[in-house]
């Protein structure tokens, strides 16, 4: 029973004896001992081949067996002994895996093998068996030795292996390991160049050939070796010069035609890998086009599409075609905005100065040479949001590590005498209320400021004339002279025929903050606007006021009259006039259809291959408004000349496909993201494809289930005035339109991105509006504020005033909301004045319209008559700036004001002329601090386009230091953890809020943002940015659903409720409980300090931890990860190589980010 064990122990002890004997013979090293050494090594080889335990004994570190064997190999000159030792090593490294191979490398085995290879080649003819053994071992060792390439070159082994392969082209047994070793050699860029000069390409092209079922393993290795060599630009040029690219294309076609059962997909993909590497250089791309490579790969890929297992071929082909697709110029005269607004002064060295100080005649749309010699490595790392554009930084580069800079410092940038002017905006702290009868009082609300000089003719609902709706809409009054037969309708001659079921505003006071989702609008046909009879034209519209208490079409028109825009808009969009009622159903996040992106990319490639099918017809152009566009009645009609509209140009490329170009922010040459435009003259039941072709961000939630929104006028007239999520086949990917270095921050070779979606319209000759997100205009805000003020009750202290005027001459409203004091007694007045201040703001970025909807929810809650709202008003004094950037909102900007700058980057040192809203908002905060009324909470509402859920960014010294790479002890940092209370409350109360997405890290690139400046300079510990997703939620009650206006307004009201609960933790009566609460949070914070998602998502999270798609298409088109310049030449490929002896397919890295 114990015999096997005893035998094993005996064999183990025997091999140890043999190793000792071999070591002794090595030390004696007498020539006469060759026979003895040969005999001992033979016995060891036999034992290793037959006993697993023997292999373990010899290969273990403690036995010293590896050193003894390598020493024998280095010293012996006997052929048979050498073969025996090589056999021993082959057995050890074959079964032992990486551990034994690592031991072999660490003991200098690689150098000994290479020296043996070189010395054996000097005595021709070389022994075939010896060379076979050496190369078989090198194949195993090479990928594990990080310096293998350098060692091979220094020992002179490169040409030895190459010559051996050259003279054994028909000897497949020896040729295979030679090619495998050459593949490992070539992973070093210097070696690849050297082998190319020595004729390696020519040798490999003698092996690579047309379809054959023989020696497929050899062919695969040869192709992989060739691909490795072609990573070198010099070798790629050599391949082009010798005409190898057409040869590869012909070989690929031959394999494609003959491999009908798809048994050799790996070989076909390897051929594509060679083509891909050649096209990494400009000369290669040119040769590819000249060899009809686009057509060849397009046709073969099209034939592969029905077979799912051929996706790797389609993906690689797509990558090559997109890389070789010629860069196109955006069809624009300039990338600067169509509209120009002269500034009072232009700061030297700023972005606007750079924009307008370009030499005359400079083309800012595309560079003279937009292609670099090497392909672009996609390093776009533009980040989102609150505070964007951090550049290309590693995880800890942007985190502030200077404790002195992190500690809040209250700075008096202006003397108090200058700040006294803001006392006017804080009258609640000085009013005595002696003249108010508290038994029968109403809040004194100043009337809305209406300047008759600002009134201009306004025409309601817009679009180009459409046969189906021409009798339902008033005519447009244009700034251009009218033809004699045109008779414009005066605004005053239009009356709104409301339905009889409308309700008075007074009946809706107590329902504020809640939309009546299930209310029905009585249907009925609409006769529309009669312009050919009668003295008065009547437009019957749905009575949205019955559903939406704060919307009044007539009042909206009055508000539009006093709104100043740079283009001088005289038109009103239907959705803004009719209003939007939130849907009473949930809209799920769109499930991505497999292959949709690939299909869109192939359709783009067809433009080059079948260029005669492209119409290229301009149907809308803001750059050329004076010249009429030809219209055959078949094209869609576009318009964006209304408040917040943004569409610069529309080009019909196919019968039902349109390329759309967005306008830059005014006084800027980029920020193309927000869109809002109108479409008419459509056919029902037809799939229309729209491509927005000048997007700039490197990724988007459109890749993760977000849809555009659409408003149908026909549906609104029929009783459904809703913005709805729409669009299928939605994806976002890099296109072939070049971005100039002027627009890309000095970087050359950049491209724009396409956001594409497909829509099928339901009604003939409808008028539909499309937007990036639910529009919320400045005029809509003014309307809502006036309706809110009209609904104010005696218990509410409400004051609305303009803090300042914007650059464009629009007022920036400031609201003060709290509860009236119970009486005019000193005690009640003192209680009134001692309430903490809450400062809220929103819409500093015009394209983040969701922040306005959240603010609307907060305002409606604050003005409602619910007990919670009354309690909240009694707890705090609210200072609210609902729109920090009215000019940007009005003029359809995405991020900037008329100054051409991101206002959320100006809080450190705002300019009174260029950034008046920020200047005066900061001054008001400074006044509050100077008078001892520093806000308890500051929160700036934002929107986030590349993350889901609602979350917050705050400021913490401890958490910032924890996330930095500086070894700083935080034990001595005393920090009140109260900044975490409000986010934690929100996570418990608001379904859309995600605490795990919050971050409290302070970054250097954010030092000029509202959140950081108010925390650092004003001393507000609870200073936040609250980000609301533009897409939807992936957790909680709304998981899997896109977000709508009702959810956003709910978030605003829940924020107010969280402030009410926050009072418990900040009230002096609750300090004991508050301290224990903070202790719990301290422990919780320590538990989570090492969780990766605590790092600031504002800077580093690009893909928002979204799951990868099954569709492995690289949206960037030019991903070239293997050419990472940061890696050492010897480390660039060696460490990642698969086992060369395996024919398994190399993993394809062209995955969608």
Curated annotation (Swiss-Prot):
Record-listed Zn(2+) binding positions: 845, 848, 942
EC number(s) on file: 3.4.17.-, 3.4.17.24
Extent of Acidic residues compositional bias: 364-389, 1108-1128
Top-level taxonomic group: Eukaryota
Cofactor annotation: Zn(2+)
InterPro entries reported in the protein's UniProt record: ARM-like, ARM-type_fold, CBPC1/4, Cytosolic_carboxypeptidase, Pepdidase_M14_N, Peptidase_M14
GO BP term, pick one: eye photoreceptor cell differentiation
Stated role: Metallocarboxypeptidase that mediates protein deglutamylation of tubulin and non-tubulin target proteins. Catalyzes the removal of polyglutamate side chains present on the gamma-carboxyl group of glutamate residues within the C-terminal tail of alpha- and beta-tubulin. Specifically cleaves tubulin long-side-chains, while it is not able to remove the branching point glutamate. Also catalyzes the removal of polyglutamate residues from the carboxy-terminus of alpha-tubulin as well as non-tubulin proteins.
Name assigned to this protein: Cytosolic carboxypeptidase 1
Species annotation: Danio rerio
Gene name tied to this protein: agtpbp1
């Amino acid at each position: 029973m114990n015999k096997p064990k005893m035998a094993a122990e005996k064999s183990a002890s025997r091999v140890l004896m043999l190793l000792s004997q071999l070591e002794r013979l090595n030390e004696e090293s007498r020539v006469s001992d060759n026979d003895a050494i040969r005999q001992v090594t033979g016995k060891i080889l036999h034992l290793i081949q037959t006993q697993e335990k023997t292999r373990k004994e010899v290969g273990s570190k403690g036995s010293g067996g590896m050193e003894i064997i390598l020493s024998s190999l280095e010293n012996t000159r006997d052929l048979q002994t050498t073969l025996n030792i090589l056999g021993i090593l082959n057995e050890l490294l074959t079964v032992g895996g990486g551990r034994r191979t690592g031991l072999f490398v660490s003991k200098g085995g690689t150098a000994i093998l290479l020296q043996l290879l070189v010395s054996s080649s000097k005595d021709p003819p070389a022994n075939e068996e010896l060379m076979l053994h050496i190369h078989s071992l090198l194949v195993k060792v090479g990928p594990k030795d990080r310096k293998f390439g350098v060692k091979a070159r220094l020992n002179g082994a490169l040409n030895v292996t190459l010559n051996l392969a050259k003279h054994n082209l028909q000897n497949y047994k020896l040729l295979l390991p030679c090619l495998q070793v050459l593949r490992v050699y070539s992973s070093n860029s210097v070696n690849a160049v050297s082998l190319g000069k020595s004729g390696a390409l020519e040798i490999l092209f003698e092996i690579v050939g047309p379809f054959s079922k023989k020696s497929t393993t050899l062919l695969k290795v040869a192709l992989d070796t060739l691909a490795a060599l072609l990573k070198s630009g010099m070798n790629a040029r050599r391949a082009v010069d010798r005409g190898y690219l057409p040869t590869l294309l012909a070989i690929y076609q031959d394999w494609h035609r003959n491999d009908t059962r798809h048994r050799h997909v790996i070989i076909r993909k390897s051929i594509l890998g060679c083509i891909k590497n050649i096209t990494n250089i400009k000369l290669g791309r040119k040769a590819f086009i000249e060899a009809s490579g686009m057509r060849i790969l397009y046709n073969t890929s099209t034939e592969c599409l029905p077979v799912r297992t051929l996706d790797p071929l389609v993906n690689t082909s797509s990558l090559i075609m997109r890389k070789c697709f010629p860069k196109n110029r955006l069809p624009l005269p300039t990338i600067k905005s169509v509209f120009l607004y002269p500034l009072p002064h232009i700061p030297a060295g700023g972005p606007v100065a750079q924009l307008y100080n370009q030499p005359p005649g400079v083309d800012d749309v595309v560079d003279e040479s937009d292609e670099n010699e090497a392909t672009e490595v996609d390093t776009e790392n533009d980040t989102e949001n609150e505070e964007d554009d951090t550049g290309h930084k590693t995880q800890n580069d942007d985190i502030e590590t200077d404790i002195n800079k992190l500690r809040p410092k209250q700075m008096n940038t202006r003397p108090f005498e200058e700040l006294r002017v803001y006392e006017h905006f804080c009258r609640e702290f000085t009013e005595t209320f002696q003249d108010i009868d508290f038994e029968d009082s109403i809040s004194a609300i100043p009337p809305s400021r209406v300047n008759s000089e600002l009134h201009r003719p306004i025409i309601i609902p817009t679009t180009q004339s459409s046969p189906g709706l021409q009798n339902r809409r008033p005519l447009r009054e244009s700034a251009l002279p009218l033809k004699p037969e045109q008779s414009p309708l005066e605004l005053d001659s239009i009356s709104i025929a409301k339905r009889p079921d409308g309700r008075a505003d007074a009946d809706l006071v107590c329902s504020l903050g809640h939309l009546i989702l299930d209310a029905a609008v009585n249907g009925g046909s609409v006769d529309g606007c009669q312009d050919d009879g009668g003295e008065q034209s009547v437009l019957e519209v749905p009575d949205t006021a019955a559903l939406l208490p704060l919307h009044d079409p007539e009042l909206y028109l009055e508000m539009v009259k006093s709104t100043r825009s740079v283009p001088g808009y005289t038109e009103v969009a239907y959705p803004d006039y009719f209003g939007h009622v939130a849907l009473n159903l949930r809209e799920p996040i769109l499930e991505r259809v497999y292959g949709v992106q690939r299909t869109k990319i192939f359709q783009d490639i067809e433009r080059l291959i079948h260029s005669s099918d492209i119409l290229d017809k301009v149907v809308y152009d803001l750059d050329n408004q004076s010249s009429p566009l030809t219209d055959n009645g078949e094209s869609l009609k576009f318009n964006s000349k209304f408040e917040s509209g943004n569409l610069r140009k529309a080009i019909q490329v196919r019968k039902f496909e349109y390329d759309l170009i967005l306008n830059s922010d005014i006084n800027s040459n980029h920020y193309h993201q927000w869109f809002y435009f109108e479409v008419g003259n459509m056919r029902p039941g037809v799939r229309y494809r729209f491509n927005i072709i000048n997007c700039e961000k490197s990724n988007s939630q459109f890749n993760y289930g977000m849809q555009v929104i659409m408003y149908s006028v026909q549906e609104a007239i029929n009783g459904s005035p809703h913005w709805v999520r729409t669009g299928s086949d939605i994806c976002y990917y890099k296109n072939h339109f070049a971005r100039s270095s002027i627009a890309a921050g000095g970087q050359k070779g950049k491209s724009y991105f396409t956001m594409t979606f497909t829509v099928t319209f339901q009604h003939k000759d409808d008028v539909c509006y499309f937007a990036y997100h639910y529009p919320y205009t400045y005029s809509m805000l003014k309307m809502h504020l006036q309706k809110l003020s009209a609904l104010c009750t005696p218990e509410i202290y409400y004051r609305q005033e303009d803090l300042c005027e914007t650059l464009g001459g629009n007022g920036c409203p400031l609201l003060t909301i709290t509860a009236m004091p119970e009486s005019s007694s000193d005690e009640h007045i003192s209680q009134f004045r001692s309430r903490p201040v809450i400062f809220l703001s929103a819409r500093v970025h015009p394209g983040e319209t969701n922040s306005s909807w959240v603010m609307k929810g907060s305002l409606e809650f604050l003005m409602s008559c619910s007990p919670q709202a009354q309690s909240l008003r009694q707890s705090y004094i609210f200072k609210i700036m609902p729109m920090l950037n009215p000019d940007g909102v009005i003029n359809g900007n995405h991020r900037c004001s008329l100054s051409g700058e991101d206002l959320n980057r100006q809080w450190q040192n705002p300019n009174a002329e260029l950034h008046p809203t920020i200047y005066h908002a900061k001054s008001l905060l400074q006044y509050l601090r100077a008078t001892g009324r520093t806000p308890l909470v500051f929160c700036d509402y934002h929107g986030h386009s590349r993350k889901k859920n609602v979350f917050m960014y705050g400021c913490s010294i401890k958490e910032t230091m924890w996330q930095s790479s500086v070894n700083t002890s935080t034990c001595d940092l005393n920090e009140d953890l109260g900044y975490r209370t409000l986010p934690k409350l929100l996570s418990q109360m608001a379904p859309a809020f995600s605490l795990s997405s919050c971050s409290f890290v302070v970054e250097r690139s954010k030092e000029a943002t509202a959140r950081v400046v108010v925390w650092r300079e004003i001393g507000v510990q609870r200073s936040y940015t609250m980000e609301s997703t533009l897409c939807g939620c992936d957790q909680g009650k709304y998981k899997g659903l896109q977000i709508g206006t009702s959810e956003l307004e709910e978030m605003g009201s829940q924020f107010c409720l969280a402030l009410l609960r926050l009072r418990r933790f900040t009230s002096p009566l609750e300090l004991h409980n508050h301290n224990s609460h903070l202790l719990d949070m301290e422990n919780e914070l320590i538990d989570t300090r090492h969780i990766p998602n605590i790092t600031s998502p504002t800077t580093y999270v690009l893909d928002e931890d979204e799951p990868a798609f099954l569709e492995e298409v690289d949206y960037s088109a030019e991903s070239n990860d293997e050419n990472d310049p940061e890696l050492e030449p010897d480390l660039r490929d060696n460490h990642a190589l698969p086992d060369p002896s395996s024919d398994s397919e190399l993993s394809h890295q062209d995955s969608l980010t």
